[in-house]
Regions:
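Gram-positive cell-envelope targeting signals
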Residues: 5, 52, 90-93, 176, ...
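C-terminal flanking helix
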Residues: 18-21, 25, 246, 250
Length: 285
């Protein structure tokens, strides 16, 4: 068995056992989940890194979603995923209580999952650092406001392990899950590529998360702040896995530094000229 196959097997087995043991913990049958550890420090990730898309690609895709007569109803949600970096399971788990429009805060404290059996479960965030409060930008605030105001009122208000008032629900009133959005993104990208000659790469909810992190890194967000926003327990995960800065970014940084140096020289030159002028005036006096 290859290293990649071993890694995938371990991840698959843990993915099955972790939620099962978590249910035992929730039912007070166990004190601690033995599979609650993070794989980052246990196995080396040999899979190909899922790349972020560029800001230009993101904007083109969002415009397509906004203007398309089929996918326009998903625009607010997709915009939020691109501009908050939330995990899709965190987004699907959001309830009305988690969205503070008055103070413009998103309270992320759980995630929703659905098993093959069809049973729904409310789980803790992926790591303890995943429990966090995210501030809303003006645009993200407007997206959430629209979702809340247009939330269907004719669907049943289901309760999952004490949680109710889910923001995004399916036709039966159940909270939507990651699989819903994986399929939507897949079909939306296919529709985009059927229309436009310049093809869009594969986009998933997780690509949205990668893209958000990379865009924040390009904007020179403080690394510790970015770690908090992403909900990572280790900053190395933030910087090594979720940032995809390349040659163009390096060129932009060199240009930026050159512009800063030129501006600094110009300021120094102005200051010298000012000092000379003042000295001349004093001599004249």
């Amino acid at each position: 068995m290859t290293r990649i196959a071993v890694t995938l097997t371990i991840k698959t087995v843990r993915g099955v056992l972790r939620p099962a043991f978590q249910m035992a913990v929730d039912d007070d049958l166990l004190m601690k989940n033995p599979f609650g550890f993070e794989l980052v420090g246990v196995i080396y990730n040999t899979e190909k890194t899922r790349l972020a898309i560029t800001r230009e690609q993101m904007n083109k895709f969002l415009k397509f979603i906004h203007d398309d007569n089929i996918y326009c109803k998903y625009y607010e949600a997709i915009y939020i995923l691109f501009h908050t970096g939330m995990r899709i399971s965190e987004f699907c788990g959001l309830t009305l209580k988690d969205i503070d429009l008055e103070n413009r805060i998103i309270d992320i404290n759980h995630q929703v999952q659905r098993f093959r059996s069809g049973k729904y479960d409310i789980c803790p965030t992926k790591t303890s650092a995943g429990t966090r409060k995210l501030p809303m930008t003006e645009e993200v605030y407007q997206m959430f406001k629209s979702l809340v105001e247009n939330r269907p009122t004719d669907l049943p208000e289901v309760i999952v392990k004490g949680y109710a008032g889910f923001l995004i629900r399916d036709k039966d009133g159940m909270p939507e899950v990651a699989l819903h959005w994986e399929h939507r993104f897949q079909h939306a990208v296919k529709r985009y590529n059927d229309i436009y000659k310049i093809q869009m790469p594969s986009i998933t909810p997780h690509v949205c998360r990668h893209t958000y992190c990379s865009n924040q890194a390009r904007a020179r967000k403080n690394p510790k702040t970015l770690q908090y926003l992403m909900g990572h327990s280790e900053i190395s995960v933030t910087m090594d896995i979720y940032t995809h800065l390349g040659l163009d970014d390096a060129k932009d940084e060199i240009i930026r530094l050159k512009e800063l140096e030129d501006a600094r020289k110009e300021i120094n030159s102005i200051e010298r000229d000012t000092m000379r002028s003042m000295e001349s005036q004093f001599k004249y006096i």
